[in-house]
Regions:
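Adenine nucleotide-associated cytosolic modules
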Residues: 95-306
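Ubiquitin-like/PB1-type beta-grasp interaction modules and other compact soluble beta-rich domains
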Residues: 1-95
Length: 306
């Protein structure tokens, strides 16, 4: 019997670290059969299809050589001392780098995301309008999850009163433009994400140009007039819009799918800017901002993954 080593990356072991399993096996099929017997049904479901063959998103390496296009396939004979390494691939067959596997391993493990979901996230283009109290956790989480392109829009300057709830910023950032400081910090979190910073106001004249070309828009604004303008632009351009607001200890979230759900004007048909309470007058608990921002991120991911 041939003695070999079967190496499984941590992304396929529920985060318990890379496993190196010694086996006696004659060929690849024999090796896969024995390793799945050891690791159980959950592992088997992740790497093998119903016919018992490796799934199309699993690359197999013997001594560093990719065996996907080997003529012998799963009947490839093994030699003493061979090392088998399996590496997940993303849709289209391109390999994930090992660094990516480590960075995103905890979300790849989720059946709801997986490798295909990660690739969809890496291709998605999301525009977040407002990088204040709600926008901070939204852009941080989207960046950390590996969204492909992120546009952040806000005209405001960082003030000391922002710091208790807007945790992308520090005391050294006071006086800086929010989107510029946020972009610099987000690029430190994940340099692979393409980030565009736009220090502009959102009005009925600018909204369409701001969101055009994006897959999803996140409303993290604090002005009802700007919210209406953003809503109207997304409805016209058929772009999903995820609204959220928070004040005091309360928050609200609404996902708007053009031509399928109610829009912001349907829900709030006649709100006036001068009548709206704000964080400046009413206050806000930081935790509620993370709750509603987290739900917005969850809604973004659901739309991206389909």
């Amino acid at each position: 019997m041939t003695s070999i080593e079967f190496i499984i990356p941590s992304v396929l072991t529920k985060g318990s670290g890379e496993k190196k399993i010694p086996l006696d096996a004659t060929d690849l099929q024999d090796a896969f059969t024995k390793v799945t017997e050891q690791l159980g049904e959950d592992f088997k479901r992740k790497v093998l299809d119903l016919s018992g063959k490796p799934r199309s998103l699993i690359n197999i390496y013997i001594n560093g050589k990719n065996m996907r296009f080997s003529n012998d396939g799963m009947a490839t004979k093994l030699n003493n001392g061979d090392s088998i390494y399996i590496l997940p691939a993303v849709a289209g067959g391109s390999d994930l780098k090992n660094e990516d596997l480590q960075r995103y391993s905890r979300q790849i493990m989720l059946d709801e995301i997986g490798f295909v979901g990660l690739e969809k996230l890496r291709k998605a283009k999301v525009c977040v309008v407002g990088v204040g109290g709600i926008g901070n956790p939204v852009v941080t989480q989207l960046t950390a999850m590996g969204i492909g392109k992120l546009k952040i829009v806000d005209r405001d300057i960082i003030e000391i009163s922002n710091l208790h709830r807007q945790h992308l910023y520090t005391e050294e950032d006071i006086g800086k433009v929010k989107v510029e400081a946020a972009k610099a910090r987000l690029e430190q979190i994940n340099s692979s994400v393409q980030i565009e910073a736009l220090p502009n106001s959102v009005t009925k004249y600018t909204a369409e140009n701001i969101v055009k070309g994006f897959d999803i828009v996140v409303d993290a604004l604090d002005s009802i007039d700007a919210r209406y303008a953003l809503n109207d632009a997304c409805i016209k351009l058929n772009i999903p819009l995820i609204y959220a607001g928070a004040l005091g200890m309360l928050g609200s979230i609404c996902t708007i799918i053009p031509n399928k759900t109610a829009c912001l004007r349907c829900i709030f048909p006649a709100l006036a800017e001068d009548d709206m309470p704000t964080c400046s007058t009413e206050g806000v608990h930081p935790s509620i901002l993370y709750l509603v921002g987290g739900i917005q991120v969850s809604e973004v991911v659901k739309i991206v993954l389909g």
